[in-house]
Amino acid sequence: PDVISHINGGPTAIPLSEVDKLMDETDFAMEIVQCGNPKVTDYVARRAKEKGQLGRIIFGNDAPSGTGIIPLGILRNICQVASVSDIPGEIALCMATGNSAKVYNKLNTGIIAVGREADLVFMDAPMGSVANTAVEAFECGDIPGLSIIMVDGVIKAAKSRNTPPCKRAAKVI
């Protein structure tokens, strides 16, 4: 696929005028990476929203990188654009999942549908957050708590070591 990798740079970013050219003169997907420039991340997200092009944005973690290993990098990307760039939390989540699935159409993940792999993450607002849901947590800048991670329909983790506990943990019945 055609992807503008690191639209927000790595240790340094391209000028905003070049970002504008890429956004205006191509229809390529645009990858925002966790270890990139936060100001350019905000600019790209806001401009894509103004242009009705949020479907072009995907997220990358870019770890390990020269910045190091960034645990929860994709969740941090979602939080940044939802809390800083005025993107609704549920849309930011879809940018990380469904948009990536559409760009890399050979993947059978990223979209919940019959025939797709059952790779799911159950999350909620973290304890202590002002948010009441995972989406609200993204929008106020809090990383949600993860309570179950399922791969191919099988629970692989029932508690996260890297996120705060959930206000309401998922239960298997």
Regions found by a protein language model. Give the residues of each.
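Active-site core of metal-dependent hydrolases
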Residues: P1-G68
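His/Asp/Glu-enriched, well-ordered alpha-helical/loop segment
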Residues: Y43-A125
